[in-house]
Structures are given as C-alpha cells and as structure tokens.
Amino acid sequence: IFAGASLSIWRRQPALQTGVLALGALALLVANAALSAGRPLEAVVPSWIAFFVLTIGGERLELSRLMPIARTMRLAFGAISFVLLGSALCAAFVPGALRLSGLLMFATAAWLVRHDIATRTVRAAGLTRYIALSLLAGYVWLALGGAVLAANGAAPGSGLWDAALHAVLVGF
C-alpha cells in the first residue's frame, strides 16, 4: 500500500523529490517481500537502508526547493538515488554491489552537506539551529557508514558490518 501510494503521489506530482521518495518506498517493498520469501536477513538489510536513506534524502531534497540549486546538481541527486536503490537490491546477489551502495551513501551525504538548507539554518538560533546541527551530524554518520561499506564491502556479521549499520541506522 505504501509503495502504491508513493507511486500515485509521484504520478500526480512528477517531481524529483517525489520520485526519490517513491524509490525509497519501492526499496522497502522489495526488502519486505524478499524477507517474506525466505531470503536471509543480511540480504535485505541493504534495501532497508536504501529505504531509510532515500526517504530522508527525498524529504531534504523537497526542502531544498527553498534554495537555488543547479538543475544538474538536482539531477545528480536523482541519479545517485536511482543507482543506490539498484545496488541495494543487488547487494545479496552481485559481488561489489554493497561497496557501490556504500559509495552512493557517501555521495548522498556529500550532496546533502553541500546543498541541504541545514547548512544555512545552522546559523539560526534555538530549535532551528539544533535541528540543523542534528541533521549535519547525521550526514557525517551517513558518510562514515558509507565509507566503511565502500572501502571493504563489510561482510555481514563482521565488526565492520556492525559499525557501518550502526553509523547509518543509529547515527544518521
């Protein structure tokens, strides 16, 4: 239902941010279907992470409409998101796909640090500043988790796998 609703929203409002949100919903649908079909947990975790990253990324992209961002940079975010979904879905089957997912998580974090409105609202006061600082700290954790995965692929069950998952799922 969630993926269908997200696709319906994207069809009604065909914008990059709604497309990225729909990709996140698709990642969740595929991950849950794979788990229900008997795939091992570690095979679906990359798709769950993609859901998480794409959903937050899509929401932040929507808020970035308030800032002037070059069309090419917006399209770059869309391309990163699309390939992130693909690499996450393939991570259980294709050697190197998890490394690519990590690299794309790092690229997502770099894009957000460069283009998110939080880079401007961090200069505000009170709650606005607190939220901006929290978001920027989360992007650092996303970059760290992505870098760990990109550097070594982090085999499920290893200490590096745990470190990458904690960095992304707790830090981000």
Identify the function of each model-found stretch.
Residues 1-172:
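Hydrophobic alpha-helical transmembrane segments of multi-pass integral membrane proteins
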